[in-house]
């Protein structure tokens, strides 16, 4: 699995640019035996400054090509150079 980098800049497949603020854990669903299942990515839209939280695995997932056949980006979020 790809590593999501804190302070990394990522492009969402729909075009918005985000900065990862931190990686955290869901306290309500934390599993001590498998803590990776409760990881969350906290990220900020670089233009609007809105903050979002998404499960780590979802942030790191592939674009659904059946639902979005015209999207060429492979992953939901892909790291880019700072702009």
Give short role names for the model-derived ranges.
Residues 1-83:
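Mixed-charge, low-complexity intrinsically disordered regions
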């Amino acid at each position: 699995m790809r590593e999501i980098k804190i302070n990394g800049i990522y492009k969402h497949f729909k075009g918005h640019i985000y900065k990862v603020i931190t990686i955290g854990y869901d306290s309500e669903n934390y599993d001590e035996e498998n803590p990776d299942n409760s990881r969350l990515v906290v990220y900020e839209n670089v233009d609007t400054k809105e903050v979002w939280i998404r499960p780590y695995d979802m942030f790191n997932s592939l674009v659904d090509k059946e639902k979005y056949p015209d999207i060429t980006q492979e992953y939901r979020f892909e790291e880019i150079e700072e702009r």
